[in-house]
């Protein structure tokens, strides 16, 4: 248990057999890390949230790509308003997980309806790795080095070597607290703006009704 209040760690407790350095698979918290990595790349000018995702994966796109997939943007994916109603790679987990995002038939136009879609975050993690030239968590540790993420933390990969940006983060509770601190302070840490505050405000706001 970690409780941080008024910029102070007021409670920290671990229960056997767990220790402060015990790594836990964080599953869907991974998606938030992927979002921040995308925000960092946007700050670097390496992408725009309104870019069509297919422009970054020409090697994964079929010749007869569906127009709904062709129109889907990075912003649609971050908001989980893609053209898929479910996680695409679960259709056949032996096929290329990223490629499935572009080949599984869509169910509706992107940007319209919220559907929880882990393949969206997974494909965004692949995008981070393409544009940064390194594993996604390594990129985050480098860009956010002032936070001091644990050296032992890592990201699981799919069978094709892509970081599982939707569910693969394996880290300590303190790593999550440091990440939460970054968000709560809108990217400002020790007087340094690590990530644009506008991105964090948008990412943590209520953008899509789900009911």
Question: Where are the regions that the model predicts?
Answer:
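Flexible glycine/proline-enriched surface loops and loop-helix/loop-strand junctions
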Residues: 19-20, 105-110, 120-123, 158-165
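Short, solvent-exposed loop/turn and secondary-structure capping segments
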Residues: 88-91
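Active-site SXXK
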Residues: 7, 25-50, 77, 124-128, ...
């Amino acid at each position: 248990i970690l409780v941080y209040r008024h910029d102070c760690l007021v409670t920290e407790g671990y229960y056997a057999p767990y220790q402060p350095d015990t790594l836990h698979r964080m599953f869907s918290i991974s998606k938030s890390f992927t979002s921040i990595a995308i925000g960092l790349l946007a700050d670097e000018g390496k992408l725009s949230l309104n870019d069509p995702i297919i422009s970054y994966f020409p090697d994964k796109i079929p010749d007869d790509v569906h127009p709904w997939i062709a129109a889907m943007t990075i912003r649609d994916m971050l908001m989980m308003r893609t053209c898929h109603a479910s996680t695409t790679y679960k259709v056949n987990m032996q096929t290329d997980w990223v490629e499935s995002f572009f080949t599984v038939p869509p169910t509706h136009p992107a940007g319209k309806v919220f559907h929880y879609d882990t393949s969206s975050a997974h494909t965004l993690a692949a995008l981070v790795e393409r544009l940064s030239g390194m594993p996604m968590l390594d990129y985050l540790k480098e860009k956010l080095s002032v936070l001091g993420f644990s050296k032992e933390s890592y990201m699981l990969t799919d069978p094709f070597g892509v970081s599982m940006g939707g569910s693969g983060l394996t880290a300590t509770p303190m790593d999550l607290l440091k990440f939460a601190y970054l968000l709560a302070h809108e990217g400002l840490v020790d007087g340094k703006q690590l990530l644009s505050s506008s991105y964090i405000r948008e990412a943590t706001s209520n953008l899509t009704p789900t009911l």
